[in-house]
Amino acid sequence: MSLAGKTLFITGASRGIGKAIALRAARDGANVIVAAKTDKPHPRLPGTVHSAVDEIDAAGGTGMACVVDIRFEEQVEEAVGRTAEKFGGIDILVNNASAIFLAGTLDTPMKRFDLMHQVNVRGTYLCSQKCLPHLLSASNAHILNISPPLTMEQQWFAPHVAYTMAKYGMSQCVLGMSAEFKSKQIAVNALWPRTAIATAAVQNLLGGAEAMRCCRKPEIMADAAHWILTQDSSSCTGNFFVDDDVLQTAGITNLDQYAIDPTAELMPDFFL
Protein backbone atom coordinates (compact mmCIF):
# COMPACT_ATOMS: atom_id res chain seq x y z
CA MET A 1 0.00 0.00 0.00
CA SER A 2 1.14 3.53 -0.77
CA LEU A 3 0.44 7.08 0.35
CA ALA A 4 1.02 8.41 -3.17
CA GLY A 5 -1.15 11.45 -3.81
CA LYS A 6 -2.39 11.60 -0.22
CA THR A 7 -2.25 14.86 1.72
CA LEU A 8 -0.89 14.63 5.26
CA PHE A 9 -1.08 17.40 7.85
CA ILE A 10 1.62 16.61 10.43
CA THR A 11 2.13 18.72 13.55
CA GLY A 12 5.62 19.09 14.97
CA ALA A 13 7.13 17.79 11.73
CA SER A 14 10.18 20.04 11.59
CA ARG A 15 12.29 17.42 13.41
CA GLY A 16 12.27 14.07 15.18
CA ILE A 17 9.42 11.58 14.85
CA GLY A 18 7.18 14.00 12.99
CA LYS A 19 9.79 14.65 10.32
CA ALA A 20 10.56 10.94 9.98
CA ILE A 21 6.87 10.21 9.35
CA ALA A 22 6.80 13.06 6.83
CA LEU A 23 9.82 11.75 4.94
CA ARG A 24 8.43 8.20 4.81
CA ALA A 25 5.23 9.54 3.26
CA ALA A 26 7.25 11.70 0.88
CA ARG A 27 9.00 8.61 -0.48
CA ASP A 28 5.58 7.45 -1.68
CA GLY A 29 4.94 10.77 -3.42
CA ALA A 30 2.61 12.25 -0.81
CA ASN A 31 1.80 15.89 -0.15
CA VAL A 32 3.08 16.73 3.32
CA ILE A 33 2.28 19.79 5.40
CA VAL A 34 4.92 20.59 8.00
CA ALA A 35 2.89 22.33 10.70
CA ALA A 36 5.30 23.53 13.39
CA LYS A 37 6.53 26.63 15.21
CA THR A 38 10.17 26.63 14.17
CA ASP A 39 10.59 29.25 11.46
CA LYS A 40 14.26 30.00 12.20
CA PRO A 41 17.04 27.67 13.43
CA HIS A 42 17.25 27.09 17.19
CA PRO A 43 20.68 26.61 18.82
CA ARG A 44 19.65 23.40 20.63
CA LEU A 45 16.97 22.12 18.26
CA PRO A 46 18.10 21.53 14.68
CA GLY A 47 15.63 21.88 11.84
CA THR A 48 12.92 24.31 10.74
CA VAL A 49 9.68 23.97 8.80
CA HIS A 50 11.59 25.15 5.73
CA SER A 51 14.48 22.68 5.99
CA ALA A 52 11.96 19.86 6.55
CA VAL A 53 10.10 20.85 3.38
CA ASP A 54 13.38 20.81 1.45
CA GLU A 55 13.97 17.24 2.63
CA ILE A 56 10.39 16.22 1.78
CA ASP A 57 10.74 17.56 -1.74
CA ALA A 58 14.11 15.83 -2.16
CA ALA A 59 12.57 12.53 -1.00
CA GLY A 60 9.94 12.65 -3.73
CA GLY A 61 7.02 14.33 -2.01
CA THR A 62 5.51 17.78 -2.21
CA GLY A 63 6.05 19.72 0.99
CA MET A 64 4.41 22.84 2.34
CA ALA A 65 5.61 24.80 5.37
CA CYS A 66 3.05 26.15 7.82
CA VAL A 67 4.48 28.14 10.71
CA VAL A 68 1.80 27.49 13.31
CA ASP A 69 1.43 27.32 17.09
CA ILE A 70 -1.30 24.74 17.61
CA ARG A 71 -2.38 26.40 20.85
CA PHE A 72 -4.09 29.11 18.82
CA GLU A 73 -7.32 28.40 16.95
CA GLU A 74 -6.87 31.13 14.33
CA GLN A 75 -3.42 29.83 13.38
CA VAL A 76 -4.66 26.26 13.02
CA GLU A 77 -7.66 27.38 10.98
CA GLU A 78 -5.40 29.33 8.64
CA ALA A 79 -2.96 26.43 8.21
CA VAL A 80 -5.74 23.92 7.53
CA GLY A 81 -7.38 26.34 5.11
CA ARG A 82 -4.14 26.90 3.20
CA THR A 83 -3.63 23.16 2.98
CA ALA A 84 -7.11 22.47 1.62
CA GLU A 85 -6.82 25.33 -0.85
CA LYS A 86 -3.49 24.12 -2.24
CA PHE A 87 -4.08 20.38 -2.29
CA GLY A 88 -7.87 20.14 -2.51
CA GLY A 89 -8.37 18.51 0.87
CA ILE A 90 -6.72 16.61 3.71
CA ASP A 91 -6.56 12.81 3.90
CA ILE A 92 -4.48 12.24 7.02
CA LEU A 93 -3.78 14.11 10.25
CA VAL A 94 -0.83 13.14 12.43
CA ASN A 95 -0.99 14.75 15.88
CA ASN A 96 2.68 14.54 16.77
CA ALA A 97 3.41 17.92 18.40
CA SER A 98 3.92 17.59 22.13
CA ALA A 99 5.34 19.46 25.11
CA ILE A 100 7.21 17.67 27.88
CA PHE A 101 8.27 18.59 31.42
CA LEU A 102 9.28 15.71 33.66
CA ALA A 103 8.81 16.78 37.27
CA GLY A 104 6.67 16.01 40.28
CA THR A 105 3.72 18.04 41.44
CA LEU A 106 5.65 20.40 43.72
CA ASP A 107 8.26 21.09 41.05
CA THR A 108 5.94 21.74 38.10
CA PRO A 109 5.22 25.46 37.59
CA MET A 110 1.67 26.10 36.43
CA LYS A 111 2.99 27.67 33.22
CA ARG A 112 4.54 24.27 32.39
CA PHE A 113 1.30 22.48 33.31
CA ASP A 114 -0.64 24.87 31.09
CA LEU A 115 1.78 24.52 28.18
CA MET A 116 1.59 20.71 28.18
CA HIS A 117 -2.19 20.73 28.29
CA GLN A 118 -2.50 23.48 25.70
CA VAL A 119 -0.20 21.71 23.23
CA ASN A 120 -0.81 18.03 23.93
CA VAL A 121 -4.51 17.91 24.73
CA ARG A 122 -6.03 21.11 23.38
CA GLY A 123 -3.75 21.19 20.34
CA THR A 124 -4.58 17.60 19.41
CA TYR A 125 -8.30 18.21 19.86
CA LEU A 126 -8.16 21.51 17.96
CA CYS A 127 -6.23 20.14 14.98
CA SER A 128 -8.57 17.15 14.82
CA GLN A 129 -11.63 19.40 14.95
CA LYS A 130 -10.39 21.66 12.15
CA CYS A 131 -9.19 18.81 9.90
CA LEU A 132 -12.28 16.62 10.35
CA PRO A 133 -14.51 18.48 7.86
CA HIS A 134 -11.91 17.66 5.19
CA LEU A 135 -11.34 14.11 6.44
CA LEU A 136 -15.08 13.45 6.18
CA SER A 137 -14.88 13.85 2.42
CA ALA A 138 -11.55 12.02 2.02
CA SER A 139 -10.99 8.44 0.95
CA ASN A 140 -9.44 6.19 3.62
CA ALA A 141 -9.08 9.05 6.10
CA HIS A 142 -6.89 8.65 9.17
CA ILE A 143 -6.01 10.49 12.37
CA LEU A 144 -2.92 9.21 14.16
CA ASN A 145 -1.94 10.52 17.59
CA ILE A 146 1.58 9.93 18.89
CA SER A 147 0.43 8.98 22.37
CA PRO A 148 0.55 5.99 24.72
CA PRO A 149 -1.83 3.17 25.56
CA LEU A 150 -4.19 4.05 28.41
CA THR A 151 -2.73 1.69 31.00
CA MET A 152 -3.63 4.03 33.89
CA GLU A 153 -0.99 2.60 36.22
CA GLN A 154 0.20 4.65 39.20
CA GLN A 155 3.88 4.13 38.34
CA TRP A 156 3.43 6.36 35.27
CA PHE A 157 1.65 9.12 37.17
CA ALA A 158 3.74 9.42 40.32
CA PRO A 159 7.01 10.82 38.84
CA HIS A 160 5.37 13.37 36.49
CA VAL A 161 1.63 13.71 37.06
CA ALA A 162 1.16 16.71 34.77
CA TYR A 163 2.98 15.19 31.78
CA THR A 164 1.14 11.89 32.12
CA MET A 165 -2.21 13.67 32.31
CA ALA A 166 -1.38 15.59 29.13
CA LYS A 167 -0.23 12.55 27.14
CA TYR A 168 -3.17 10.46 28.28
CA GLY A 169 -5.42 13.33 27.19
CA MET A 170 -4.17 12.76 23.64
CA SER A 171 -4.99 9.07 24.00
CA GLN A 172 -8.45 9.85 25.31
CA CYS A 173 -9.04 11.71 22.05
CA VAL A 174 -8.38 8.40 20.29
CA LEU A 175 -10.74 6.55 22.62
CA GLY A 176 -13.57 8.98 22.00
CA MET A 177 -13.09 10.07 18.39
CA SER A 178 -12.54 6.55 17.06
CA ALA A 179 -16.02 5.64 18.31
CA GLU A 180 -17.55 8.97 17.29
CA PHE A 181 -16.35 8.77 13.67
CA LYS A 182 -16.32 5.00 13.07
CA SER A 183 -19.58 5.19 11.12
CA LYS A 184 -17.97 7.85 8.91
CA GLN A 185 -15.04 5.50 8.19
CA ILE A 186 -12.43 7.83 9.67
CA ALA A 187 -9.77 5.83 11.48
CA VAL A 188 -8.44 7.27 14.73
CA ASN A 189 -5.49 5.44 16.28
CA ALA A 190 -2.53 6.00 18.62
CA LEU A 191 1.09 4.95 18.12
CA TRP A 192 3.76 4.82 20.81
CA PRO A 193 7.38 3.59 20.82
CA ARG A 194 8.47 0.57 22.85
CA THR A 195 11.83 2.23 23.53
CA ALA A 196 13.13 5.76 23.76
CA ILE A 197 13.57 7.38 20.36
CA ALA A 198 16.65 9.40 19.41
CA THR A 199 15.23 12.91 19.39
CA ALA A 200 16.33 16.30 20.67
CA ALA A 201 14.05 15.82 23.68
CA VAL A 202 15.92 12.70 24.75
CA GLN A 203 19.30 14.31 24.19
CA ASN A 204 18.41 17.48 26.09
CA LEU A 205 16.26 16.03 28.88
CA LEU A 206 17.21 12.41 29.47
CA GLY A 207 20.98 12.14 29.42
CA GLY A 208 22.73 13.47 26.34
CA ALA A 209 24.85 11.35 24.03
CA GLU A 210 24.96 8.35 26.38
CA ALA A 211 21.17 8.18 26.49
CA MET A 212 21.02 8.48 22.69
CA ARG A 213 23.10 5.29 22.37
CA CYS A 214 20.26 3.41 24.05
CA CYS A 215 17.59 4.66 21.65
CA ARG A 216 16.06 3.58 18.40
CA LYS A 217 15.95 5.87 15.37
CA PRO A 218 12.77 7.84 14.56
CA GLU A 219 12.46 5.74 11.40
CA ILE A 220 10.97 2.87 13.44
CA MET A 221 8.01 5.10 14.27
CA ALA A 222 7.83 6.30 10.66
CA ASP A 223 7.66 2.76 9.27
CA ALA A 224 5.04 1.78 11.85
CA ALA A 225 2.99 4.90 11.11
CA HIS A 226 3.18 4.19 7.38
CA TRP A 227 1.71 0.72 7.90
CA ILE A 228 -1.13 2.09 10.04
CA LEU A 229 -1.96 4.90 7.63
CA THR A 230 -2.21 2.51 4.68
CA GLN A 231 -4.73 0.22 6.40
CA ASP A 232 -8.47 0.26 5.71
CA SER A 233 -9.88 3.13 7.75
CA SER A 234 -13.24 1.43 8.14
CA SER A 235 -11.78 -1.41 10.19
CA CYS A 236 -8.37 -0.31 11.55
CA THR A 237 -9.52 2.16 14.18
CA GLY A 238 -9.54 2.65 17.95
CA ASN A 239 -6.17 0.94 18.41
CA PHE A 240 -3.31 1.83 20.72
CA PHE A 241 -0.40 0.54 18.68
CA VAL A 242 3.21 0.01 19.80
CA ASP A 243 5.84 0.46 17.09
CA ASP A 244 7.61 -2.90 17.17
CA ASP A 245 4.31 -4.81 17.42
CA VAL A 246 3.16 -3.03 14.26
CA LEU A 247 6.36 -3.92 12.42
CA GLN A 248 6.04 -7.56 13.44
CA THR A 249 2.53 -7.57 11.97
CA ALA A 250 3.94 -5.94 8.83
CA GLY A 251 6.54 -8.70 8.54
CA ILE A 252 9.57 -6.62 9.53
CA THR A 253 11.64 -8.75 11.90
CA ASN A 254 15.08 -7.11 11.82
CA LEU A 255 14.73 -4.40 14.44
CA ASP A 256 18.49 -3.97 14.85
CA GLN A 257 18.41 -1.72 11.79
CA TYR A 258 16.61 0.88 13.91
CA ALA A 259 19.06 0.89 16.82
CA ILE A 260 21.43 3.83 17.21
CA ASP A 261 23.95 1.41 18.71
CA PRO A 262 23.00 -2.27 18.31
CA THR A 263 25.42 -3.18 21.13
CA ALA A 264 23.72 -0.91 23.68
CA GLU A 265 20.84 -1.97 25.91
CA LEU A 266 17.68 -0.22 24.77
CA MET A 267 16.01 2.27 27.11
CA PRO A 268 12.31 1.48 27.65
CA ASP A 269 9.94 4.34 26.98
CA PHE A 270 7.41 5.71 29.45
CA PHE A 271 3.95 4.16 29.84
CA LEU A 272 4.82 0.58 28.79
Name the predicted role of every residue range.
Residues 104-105, 109-114:
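Substrate-binding pocket helix/loop in short-chain dehydrogenase/reductase
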Residues 2-87, 101, 111:
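Short-chain dehydrogenase/reductase
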Residues 190-191, 208-272:
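C-terminal helical subdomain
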Residues 6, 61-62, 89-90, 135-149, ...:
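Active-site loop of short-chain dehydrogenase/reductase
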Residues 128-129, 175:
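A short, exposed helix-loop element centered on a Lys and neighboring polar residues
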Residues 136, 142-183, 192-197:
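Catalytic loop of short-chain dehydrogenase/reductase
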Residues 25, 89, 171-174, 181-193, ...:
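Conserved Rossmann-fold SDR core element
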